[in-house]
């Protein structure tokens, strides 16, 4: 009797391990029978609570691929109470990581791009597979190989969903599964050949760059690059990917989206990728590509919607309930009312006859973690005229507060790395914001309840209370789109005048001419501001370097004409100021 093997094309199903890929759905099987030789004897991977198989992985493996592998092993342990050993493919006999010849007596599950002959042969057998995976039983081994991390994760999920039986794992000797994401009729193929990307004519560079990069990624995967054009033009086919707030009715129909959030929607011939900011729109584009590559979006013929929920992650933030905050020092020190008066602070910063002002370095670090919401709010309540904060971007384009590129110094990363699907990398750019919410900021070397805050939360604290010293640690932040729209969303535009100067405020005024209150603020401040924030900061640093960050240093600086101090001791400075200064007579 003739046997058949199955060439598997993926259409849509549920992922067994959603924690590995971050998605909740995955492709289902459509099988095409292909006539072949009689099947080989099946492989008994696990039976009677025991297994002789070992998982082999590459010596160097991507964090997320490794996380998927460990989740795969965990699922086997939870079902059968058997923990398969995991070893790397490195051997003393193969120091250069060259191909290890086949040994059928060694029972292995080869996961990823290992140096085993079976893995190499599989990759060579499918040279045209640009995005997808292959799972094959060969030479007593199970080979699970993907073109990228997302595809490998899907392969592990597919194998587990299909092969984890009631009491054993038995794999047919002719087992073969192939998934080609770019096959004819698949979403990537349809997008490449039938869709046009549409961007608003006036969209910032970030949106245009993200759209063009998406088109390039589609070309790399399918060999065909979709067109990218402004919304002032019509597409030939009518099938459009609407990027950002285009003039199309489908974009407007999405409605208002909060600053950090975005929506992905498939409706008829339109695919809408829309965020509440250019950064969020970029995230929507990147997420859409991920959903395509992981097979979550397996058809363009039915309606689909995915929305981010970043604002839900900050629902309990002090920034949304400022009046509930009671600082540690409240029972020891009462701040004079004039020190927290916003108009008084502005005059101190701009008037030659004003008192000495303070720029609090990363917030009230004497009492709270640096760059934390409690630390910033405490500094503001202590009367800080300016608070310096450091900005970085997460993997999913959320502006967060963090000085270092590494998470080692300021968080409990070392205790949580790699656990529960978290990345092992210490670089903040390798973590999504949702993943960062699992970490806690350190104070005096110990973990606190504070999470890494978003710039959105921080901006809410400053509005009408203090000025922002915005120290951006990455180059990819645009003042007149990313920062302006953040300031608009949080009603904090006035708080950026110290850092960006009056010329930027005039530019921002032109971006929203209907904001009369901001127009009046710009007119007023233009009379007083004679130095840019950069020049002011330079003098602040000079004073600290010359005299030190303490009472004697502040006194000497004041006597020499310095008008501001850049301090790590805002609590001490505020007590000094309260004892030695009085309110300024405002003009």
Predicted regions and their residues:
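Bacterial N-terminal signal peptides that target proteins for export
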Residues: 1-7
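Bacterial lipoprotein signal-peptidase II cleavage site
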Residues: 21-28
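Acidic/histidine-rich, surface-exposed loop or edge segments in extracytoplasmic proteins
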Residues: 46-62, 188-203, 358-362
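C-terminal motif of bacterial Sec signal peptides marking the signal peptidase cleavage site
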Residues: 16-19
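Short, charged N-terminal beta->alpha structural module
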Residues: 55-80, 197-220
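Phosphate-group recognition and catalysis centered on beta-loop-alpha active-site segments
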Residues: 326-587
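Carboxylate-rich, divalent-cation-coordinating active-site regions
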Residues: 85-184, 188-190, 208, 221, ...
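N-terminal low-complexity, Pro/Thr/Ser-rich intrinsically disordered segments
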Residues: 29-49, 178-188, 329-358
């Amino acid at each position: 009797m003739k046997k058949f093997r199955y060439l598997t094309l993926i259409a849509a199903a549920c992922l067994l391990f959603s924690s590995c890929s971050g998605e909740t759905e995955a492709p289902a099987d459509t099988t095409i029978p292909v006539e072949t030789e009689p099947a080989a004897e099946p492989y008994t991977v696990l039976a009677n609570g025991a297994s002789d198989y070992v998982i082999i992985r590459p010596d160097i493996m991507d964090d997320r691929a490794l996380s998927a592998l460990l989740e795969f092993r965990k699922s086997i342990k939870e079902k059968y109470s058997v923990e398969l050993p995991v070893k790397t493919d490195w051997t003393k006999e193969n120091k250069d990581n060259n191909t290890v010849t086949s040994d059928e007596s060694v029972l292995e599950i080869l996961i990823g791009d290992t140096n085993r002959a079976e893995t190499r042969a599989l990759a060579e057998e499918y040279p045209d597979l640009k995005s997808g995976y292959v799972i094959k039983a060969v030479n007593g081994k199970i080979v699970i190989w993907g073109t990228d991390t997302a595809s490998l994760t899907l392969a592990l999920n597919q194998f587990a969903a299909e092969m984890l039986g009631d009491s054993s794992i038995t794999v047919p000797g002719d087992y073969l599964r192939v998934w080609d994401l770019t096959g004819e009729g698949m979403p990537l193929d349809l997008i490449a050949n039938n869709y046009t990307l549409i961007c608003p004519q006036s969209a910032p560079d970030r949106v245009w760059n993200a759209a063009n990069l998406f088109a390039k990624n589609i070309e790399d995967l399918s060999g065909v690059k979709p067109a990218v054009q402004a919304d002032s033009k019509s597409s030939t086919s009518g099938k459009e990917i609407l990027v950002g707030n285009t003039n199309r009715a489908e974009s407007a129909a999405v409605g208002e989206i909060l600053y950090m959030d975005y929506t992905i929607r498939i409706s008829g011939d339109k695919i809408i990728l829309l965020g509440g900011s250019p950064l969020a729109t970029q995230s929507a584009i990147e997420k859409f590509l991920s959903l395509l590559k992981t097979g979550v979006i397996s058809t363009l013929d039915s309606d689909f919607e995915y929305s981010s929920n970043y604002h839900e992650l900050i629902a309990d933030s002090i920034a949304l309930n400022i009046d509930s905050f009671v600082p540690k020092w409240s029972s020891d020190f009462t701040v004079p009312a004039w020190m927290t008066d916003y108009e008084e602070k502005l005059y101190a910063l701009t008037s030659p006859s004003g008192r000495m002002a303070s720029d609090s370095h990363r917030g009230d670090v004497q009492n709270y973690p640096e760059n934390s919401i409690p630390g910033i709010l405490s500094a503001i309540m202590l009367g800080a005229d300016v608070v310096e904060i450091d900005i970085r971007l997460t993997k999913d384009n959320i502006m967060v507060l963090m000085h270092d590129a590494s998470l080692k110094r300021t968080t409990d990363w070392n205790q949580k790395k790699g656990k529960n699907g978290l990345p092992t990398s210490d670089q903040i750019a390798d973590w999504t914001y949702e993943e960062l919410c699992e970490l806690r900021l350190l104070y005096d070397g110990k973990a606190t309840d504070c999470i890494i805050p978003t710039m959105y939360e921080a901006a809410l604290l400053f509005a009408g209370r203090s000025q922002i010293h915005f120290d951006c640690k990455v180059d990819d932040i645009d003042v007149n789109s990313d920062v302006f729209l953040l300031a608009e969303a949080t009603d904090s535009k006035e708080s950026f005048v110290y850092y960006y100067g009056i010329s930027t405020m005039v530019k921002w005024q032109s971006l929203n001419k209907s904001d009369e209150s901001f127009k009046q603020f710009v007119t007023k401040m233009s009379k007083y501001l004679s130095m840019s924030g950069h020049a002011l900061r330079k003098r602040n640093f000079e004073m600290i370097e010359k005299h030190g960050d303490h009472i004697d240093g502040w006194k000497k600086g004041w006597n020499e004409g310095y008008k501001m101090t850049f301090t790590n001791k805002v609590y001490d400075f505020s007590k000094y100021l309260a004892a030695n200064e009085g309110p300024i007579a405002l003009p």
